[in-house]
Amino acid sequence: MDISAYQHMNIRMSTRGKRPLRNLTPNDKVRAIQRIHNGETKASVSRDIGVPESTLRGWCKNEQKLRFMCRQLGPDHLGLDTPPEKRAKFELQLQLPPKFVALPPNYEELGFGALPYSPADYPVQNESLLEKLSLVEFVKKNGGLHPEGALHPGQAGVMDYSNNMLHQLNLLALLNSKLTPQTADVLVDAQPKSEDNKVIDSPAASEDYSKNNYPLLSVKNWAKDPAKRVNSANQPEQVNDKNNNALEANSSAPQALVTEQAKTPMFSDTTMPLLPAPFPNPADLAPVIAPVTPANAPPTGTDNQGAALLDWCKLFNASLNFLAFAAAAASMQPGGGGPGGPSYNPNQMASGGSEPDLETYPFNEALLKRLSPLAHSEASNESYCDSEPEDLSVRSCASKASSRSHTPDKSVGSSDAEQ
């Protein structure tokens, strides 16, 4: 049989004398079945297309499945076509709709209802773009982004897309550092007009925080209602002089306290946002944790360690028992810096001496009272002071038992047994 007869039927021969390899589509099989329905014999159809009659009978049994496959493929795949050329992935990523170039300059107005294009136009990045648009819509509804014309009225007509985006990102960074959306406007109004004092330092920000009682930005107080946590009607008005010092209308003692805390701040800027809202004000905790030392006395390491440990135990409610030994070790060392300072012996309490003054050692006594009442018990002293290695021989065990026995009868009995 001539091989050229199979060219119109999409059948190719590998070698002569072999049955031709069939590369028939479901549409070809349906056409062969239709020829049998039209009156042709299965033998003639099988000779024409080059398949056995048994295979043709199997096609007739699966006629419904073959017709369903033809409907699924569609009109483009009825014949045997070459597969489409493969395209690289970066070509799909670079294909953007032409409407993407004509975006509005103020990208805050982009929402799900104001999309200038359908998400189906994007082949790859539709999910990521929808996430970004939803984030913009969420922040816009919650008031996190301030409109550009409110803060910079002179630059209301900015048409550059990148400058607008950088401006909004700077606002977000300012809000996330240490402020709430309500305090941003307060700080903008509180900036001095003179060129000498344009920078507001961190003590001034802490003064503003302690005066206005604004809670710092955290997960807990961000979800609360801002009207509940801001009581601006009961707060006295602030008056700033030319040196940018906060002044009270009727009281002068809080001013001295605030200035003293501003000179020696107890908390850095990095630890301020880490304190959650339910804990008290850091300005109120400062005299309790670390009282102000005189200028001529050098700060000691034990005071700083005691303050840090006490603060840490307050945060965790002193629930860890192993810190009792650390408190005992801290209390055994004297807190005075010079040789003329008073020395504190922890064994004074056991020997009947007077209890040490709380003003001299505030942190050690507070740690001992907070952490463990068993810091100076017999078990702790025996486990830590008895550092000799134990001899496990028979004679040493007997001597240990005789030396540690509390009744004279047992000691006499043990000595008689040894003799």
Swiss-Prot record:
Coexpressed with dan in the presumptive distal antenna, but not in the leg imaginal disk. Both proteins are also expressed in the brain and the eye region of the eye-antenna disk. First detected in early L3 eye disks in cells surrounding the newly initiated morphogenetic furrow. Highly expressed in evenly spaced clusters of cells anterior to the furrow, lower levels within and posterior to the furrow. It is found in: Nucleus. One of its GO terms (cellular component) is nucleus. Its main location: nucleus. Keywords: Developmental protein, DNA-binding, Nucleus, Phosphoprotein, Transcription, Transcription regulation. InterPro entries: Homeodomain-like_sf, HTH_Psq, RD_transcriptional_regulator, WH-like_DNA-bd_sf. The keyword Phosphoprotein applies. The keyword Thylakoid does not apply. PROSITE patterns: HTH_PSQ (PS50960). Residues 15-66 form the HTH psq-type domain. It comes from the Eukaryota. Residues 333-359, 378-419 are annotated as: Disordered. One of its GO terms (molecular function) is DNA binding. Interacts with itself, dan, ey and dac to form a complex (or complexes) containing the RD factors. Probable transcription factor with a role in the retinal determination (RD) network. Regulates ato expression and is required for normal R8 induction and differentiation. Danr appears to repress Dan expression, but Dan is required for Danr expression anterior to the morphogenetic furrow (MF). Dan and Danr lie downstream of so and require dac function for highest levels of expression. This is Protein distal antenna-related. It comes from Drosophila melanogaster (Fruit fly).
